[in-house]
Amino acid sequence: MVRLARPRSGHFDLGTGYHGDLWLDLDALFLRPSRLRPHVRWLGERLREHEVDAVCGPVEGGAFLAYAVADLLGVAFLAGYRSPGEATGYHLPAVHGGIGGWRVAVVDDAVNAGTAVAACLGELRGRGAVPVAVAALMSLGQASAMVPARLGVPFYPASTVPSRAWPAERCPLCADGTPVTT
């Protein structure tokens, strides 16, 4: 799966206030949806045991994947939209009757620093929903340990990819004078 995302090594601005040493072309993952079908099933099996009412996915990320998992599970799909002017803020559109009490899983294509899933979880909690899990095609770097510890929900990655990410202001590659890869 990682091969499909055409990985590149270097010094990258991840666009979330973080820098990292790995870039993945995540849009390339969705070029041939049938290749993801086994992974969608695997993610769905993990989330089914949480009896979710909905699956949420960040539109600038795993929304296509989240939609496929929601369809497989026969539950609602919630799109997380990036908030204008905020690097890491997301908002959900209004849902008739609200989502208070809904058990919701967040699904993303890849989790690195966790900013998108953290923002979606925060928005869900703010709306009264009960986040129960995060799932992703790929866990990058320390995300497999960080998500449960920092975000308080189980994390189900279909694969793990070695990489490193740092807050931009503490990036060792910047400190060493390594130019950002374009």
Which residues make up each language-model segment?
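PRPP-associated nucleotide enzymes
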Residues: M1-T182
